[in-house]
Amino acid sequence: SLPAMSDQPLLDVRNLSIDFVTESGVTNATKGISFHLKKGETLAVVGESGSGKSVTGLALTRLLPEPPAVYRTGEIFFDGKDVLKLSPKELRALRGARIAYIFQEPSTSLNPVFTIRNQIAEAIELHRPDVTDVDEEVVKYLDMVGIVNPRQRMNDYPHQLSGGMQQRVMIAMALSCQPDILVADEPTTALDVTIQAQIIEQLVKLKEQLSMSIILITHNFGIIGGIADRVAVMFRGKIVEEGETRSVLH
């Protein structure tokens, strides 16, 4: 019998240096960073604005526009393959389906002219062509993220929902692709504190339920205590501290 693969990290980033090259010069966005993520684990990447944390998240599926981004050194191993060596077609298959994102502003990620149903259905049809009853899937994921009356609400347009509800829809859309890793970049910054707590709590529950891994990118140390297994602290493009959440926060 084969040895258990659980010790093998799902994601293994090694010595990653990314520069932005523009007419006004070169910015070192990340400087030789290394970190890993195991299956079912939550890693918080914490740092102030400009620390390189969002760049790191986007780099995982090469979402940074190239140019200006240049991958100077390093490897990003996901499921044993280096993302930096994948073809455009392989990258498209990776994005959403295996590694999905929730961004800070749901209003910019949701299309105002389509119903909630259409937007989630499109994600499901793209990444899971085998699903026969798409509407049932849409209802299932809206229900999962705590939207009441999902059957009615799925016919709403984004502007008919509150900010917190829009963010839940974004999470439902990301989860409906059944990703291995959910990258949540400041997923609750725009929301009030109570709603922030609810959504973080929801993510923790869903992680258990769907046995996925989460990378939570945030500037807010306050929200990571209850959700992250490990923390990587970024400062000016470097990881300056990394460890179990308990030891880093104390």
Task: Tell where the protein language model's regions lie, with residue ranges.
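ABC ATPase "signature
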Residues: 242-243
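A short, surface-exposed alpha-helical micro-motif characterized by mixed small hydrophobic
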Residues: 224-226
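A short, proline-enriched helix->beta-strand linker immediately N-terminal to the Walker B motif
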Residues: 176-180
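Conserved ABC ATPase "signature" region
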Residues: 82, 133-152
